[in-house]
């Protein structure tokens, strides 16, 4: 009898506390939103989930290529229980990336829309009480041309670590980064959307049980680069308090356009059938195009693919961040050298084989035979110019350095991929971390070296720590998908704990975790994988080699000055 009473009492408590009888409704600055409660196995307290909350006015019509405007208020209870559309992009590439990276049991097919400035919230807070939990704001990757917030389910991270997880969207591709390099279309619209989302968090997250005074921004790939840009931007001051860049920083050359951006703007205008006489003419014409017409233009531009035929110096596989004088007053290199950035604790890391499989596969590198000779490697490295910006005359030395030590064509292929990974990810990440450390701010570095069981069957078994592999651990995929080993479950628990500790305290260390040294003059960092351990001097030899090599090019080509014959 007492057992039945205990069960009934437990059920009553569960209705009141575990799964409240009515779904959550929260009052935001703009109006009320209705969410849903979702329970994760092993947790009595459900997570309140709100999907598709608008944080800005839809950037349509005359608002295309302009900074985001505040959302319009509403007077009813807005239903926030279904996924928002992802921002306009190449639907096939976007879907492929989502399927490869999602931590959900089933990938969610998403609609496309130019009206896409929405965010999702996962809060484990008891909304009847005044909680103040740390907030973690996720910025998705996808080369600034594809991607969606809803690929990443914040449920496991929120439940396991008692943090509020917010995943945000931002305009992509032409919509997000079209720049004429002048006042007609400055560019960086997608980054301004990220800032608008962070302002929304400041104004509203307390109502969801989050602490606006403890906001961590974290992102991967182009999301990591975005985090790094926000760390450098005066416009982001006080909008976040810690930052994590996974596999991407503002020195990732492919994502930051320096110099004249006009030729790329003209290429886009021509592809859209617009005149290119002046910036004003191009912008006016592109604003008149329908979303479908700009999608066709996007496909013509062949973003995310390697051009094997044309002049690599005129190829643009990505549209990127620009030095607009506002978001970025100067180049990332100059802002770092002058130590003009937001001095928040910063975690920077990358994976052991960033060019292992997913990027060369998506970009169409001709490596299906799995081997490479020196001559082909040099030619491919030149074709990779828009990714790595290695001048033609430096290619023999760079290729020899990486591939020269072996005659095995399979090893040559692997070393070629290491070269690309170092120039695009590892070396820029270490340089950013060193600058941050030198400014006297807590800095932590990691290298992720693990092959998730959720990897695509097409990925060679030898690839361990591919681009994006850490996402499964960070977002607790083993607790949402089936089939993870005990080792993988433990790894994900540890990674979530490290990331959330960092969000809580600006320091990833905590009880029962391997010690993660701060990145100081000794350059200690953490190797994360089946065996997680501290090590030193991450990629220091590679940084030295590339710094010296790139300096040669700078020395050989002094600034052009007019030469006057007397």
From Swiss-Prot:
Glycosylation (residues): 79
GO molecular function annotations of the record: carboxylesterase activity; sterol ester esterase activity
Main location group: endoplasmic reticulum
Enzyme class: hydrolase
Disulfide bonds: 87-116, 274-285
Catalytic residues identified in the record: 221 (acyl-ester intermediate), 354 (charge relay system), 467 (charge relay system)
Entry EC number(s): 3.1.1.1, 3.1.1.13
Residues recorded as bearing Phosphoserine in the entry: 379
Signal peptide limits: 1-18
Keywords: Cytoplasm, Disulfide bond, Endoplasmic reticulum, Glycoprotein, Hydrolase, Lipid droplet, Lipid metabolism, Phosphoprotein, Serine esterase, Signal
Example of a GO biological process term: negative regulation of cholesterol storage
Catalysed reactions listed for this entry: a carboxylic ester + H2O = an alcohol + a carboxylate + H(+); cholesteryl (9Z-octadecenoate) + H2O = cholesterol + (9Z)-octadecenoate + H(+); 2-(5Z,8Z,11Z,14Z-eicosatetraenoyl)-glycerol + H2O = glycerol + (5Z,8Z,11Z,14Z)-eicosatetraenoate + H(+); prostaglandin E2 1-glyceryl ester + H2O = prostaglandin E2 + glycerol + H(+)
Subunit record text: Homotrimer and homohexamer. Binds to beta-glucuronidase.
Similarity comment: Belongs to the type-B carboxylesterase/lipase family.
Function statement: Involved in the detoxification of xenobiotics and in the activation of ester and amide prodrugs. Hydrolyzes aromatic and aliphatic esters, but has no catalytic activity toward amides or a fatty acyl-CoA ester. Displays fatty acid ethyl ester synthase activity, catalyzing the ethyl esterification of oleic acid to ethyloleate. Converts monoacylglycerides to free fatty acids and glycerol. Hydrolyzes of 2-arachidonoylglycerol and prostaglandins.
The protein's name in its UniProt record: Liver carboxylesterase 1
Organism listed in the record: Macaca fascicularis
């Amino acid at each position: 009898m007492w057992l039945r009473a205990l069960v009934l009492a437990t059920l009553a408590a569960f209705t009141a506390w575990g799964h409240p009888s009515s779904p959550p409704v929260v009052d935001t600055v703009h109006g009320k939103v209705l969410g849903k409660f979702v329970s994760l196995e092993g947790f009595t307290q459900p997570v309140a989930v709100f999907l598709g909350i608008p944080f800005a006015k839809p950037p349509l019509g005359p608002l295309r290529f302009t900074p985001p405007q505040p959302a319009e208020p509403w007077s009813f209870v807005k239903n926030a229980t279904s996924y928002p559309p992802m921002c306009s992009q190449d639907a096939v590439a976007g879907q492929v990336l989502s399927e490869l990276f999602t931590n959900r049991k089933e990938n969610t097919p998403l609609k496309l829309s130019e009206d896409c400035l929405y965010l999702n919230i996962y809060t484990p807070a008891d909304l009847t009480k005044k909680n103040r939990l740390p907030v973690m704001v996720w910025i998705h990757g996808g080369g600034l041309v594809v991607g969606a917030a809803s690929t990443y389910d914040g449920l496991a991270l929120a439940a396991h670590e008692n943090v509020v997880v917010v995943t945000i969207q931002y305009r992509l591709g032409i919509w997000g980064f079209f720049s004429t390099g002048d006042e007609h279309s400055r560019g960086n619209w997608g980054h301004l959307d990220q800032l608008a989302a962070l302002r929304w968090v400041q104004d509203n997250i307390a109502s969801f049980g989050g602490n606006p005074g403890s906001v961590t921004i974290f992102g991967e790939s182009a999301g990591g680069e975005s985090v790094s840009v926000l760390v450098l931007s005066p416009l982001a001051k006080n909008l976040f308090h810690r930052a994590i860049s996974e596999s991407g920083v503002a020195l990732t050359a492919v994502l930051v356009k320096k110099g004249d951006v006009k030729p790329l703007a003209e290429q886009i205008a021509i592809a859209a059938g617009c005149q290119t006489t002046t910036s004003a003419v191009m912008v006016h014409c592109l604003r008149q195009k329908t979303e479908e017409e700009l999608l066709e233009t996007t496909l013509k531009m062949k973003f995310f693919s390697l051009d094997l035929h044309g002049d690599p110096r005129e190829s643009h596989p990505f549209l990127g961040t620009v030095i607009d004088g506002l978001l970025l007053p100067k180049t990332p290199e100059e802002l770092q050298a002058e130590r003009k950035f937001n001095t928040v604790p910063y975690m920077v890391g990358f994976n052991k084989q960033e060019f292992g499989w997913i990027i060369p596969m998506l970009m169409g590198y001709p490596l299906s035979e799995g081997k490479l000779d020196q001559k082909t490697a040099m030619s491919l490295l030149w074709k990779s110019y828009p990714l790595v910006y290695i001048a033609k005359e430096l290619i023999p030395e760079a290729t020899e350095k990486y591939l020269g030590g072996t005659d095995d064509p399979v090893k040559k292929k692997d070393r070629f991929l290491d070269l690309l990974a170092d120039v695009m990810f590892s070396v820029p990440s270490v340089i950013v971390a060193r600058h941050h450390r030198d400014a006297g701010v807590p800095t932590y570095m990691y290298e992720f070296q693990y092959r998730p069981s959720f990897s695509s069957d097409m990925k060679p078994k030898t690839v361990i720590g591919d681009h994006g592999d850490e996402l499964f651990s960070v977002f607790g995929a083993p607790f949402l998908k089936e089939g993870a080993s005990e080792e993988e479950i433990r790894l994900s628990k540890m990674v979530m704990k490290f990331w959330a500790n960092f969000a809580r305290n600006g320091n990833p260390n905590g009880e029962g975790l391997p010690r993660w040294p701060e990145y100081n003059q000794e350059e200690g960092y953490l190797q994360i994988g089946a065996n997680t351990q501290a090590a030193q001097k991450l990629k220091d030899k590679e940084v030295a080699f590339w710094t010296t090599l790139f300096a040669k090019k700078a020395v050989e080509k002094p600034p052009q000055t007019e030469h006057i014959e007397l």
